[in-house]
Amino acid sequence: MQIDLCIDKEKSSTEKGRILEHLVAQLLTIQQYEVVETIRVTGMEIDVFAKHKINNSTLLVECKAWESPLPADVISKLLGNVVLRHADQGWLVSTGPLSKDAKGIKSEWENKNDAERAMLSFYTNDRILDLLLNSGKIISSDQVKKKLESKYFADDITLMLTEKKYYWVVPILNNQYGTVSYKMYLMQQMENVLMILIY
């Protein structure tokens, strides 16, 4: 499954990043963090800064809504910012793929001992979807498929994030006509269905 961010064509790619930042802020608020989105401090911009309400731990979050593979230097820069700002943790949240080198760094980092590993966490599509499911922000794609009552699903179901709502986009194959139709389910109101036919 993948996650796509959708903005009006008149808006900048910065707006796309803000959708992801806002989503991360919502998830952190659920986890008892006080959140500030997009702050500028000497020498850096922080997409999301959070401080835990109970234990006062601090968290810097770098959000990347890129379609191209994320380069390894993004990870190095985030880790440097965590150390420089004396934060307790850093999160890299990315809806796009990691480059080969970035995957290597992620793998190395996640094999460190628990104390070291706690300083940096990686949230790619699967982990973002898990957070959304566990927080109750979305229902599972399997639940959506059951509601659609079709036997011919394509495998590439997508979670589409917009400025205001989240949608599952489910390709349904029509074997009789050789077409694909897309059904979009609004997360908060399962009764509302929008169907777009692609010919």
Language-model-derived ranges and their functions:
Residues M1-Y199:
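Mixed-charge (Asp/Glu-Lys/Arg
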